[in-house]
Amino acid sequence: MVGALELVTSIAGLIAFVETLLGFASELRSLSSDCSSLVDELAVLNRVLNEVDREFRESINLCTAEARATTLDVLEGCILQCKATCEELRDVINRIRRSKAKKVRARLEAGKIREGLKRLERDKSTLRLMMATIT
């Protein structure tokens, strides 16, 4: 289990990572509706992560030691899961960006993009639930 400071650092790192992904994905928005949806979902994830970061910083010291330990443990798992999803999407985005036939590559990667979108939705829901628990 990590401490509060390490978790704050992990959240900040994930926010920076998502912002970078968002920039790369924005270059691909016009290739397909899946790429456009990916940009939208990454933007929402970025907002959710910023909200979680703010709520976590404001309220983590207000809860009991037991509640704090549970919150740290569960939120760490959520952040790691979200990071794994983003890493997989980064790989897909990079394959499309490096392709000479971006539109064709985007179509070939459509299934992976859709799967990533489903995972992002699940990750965001989990983070929102966690945020509701924190407050």
Question: How should these model regions be labeled?
Answer:
Residues 5, 79, 116-117:
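A generic alpha-helix preference that emphasizes hydrophobic side chains
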Residues 1-70, 74, 89, 96, ...:
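N-terminal amphipathic alpha-helical segments
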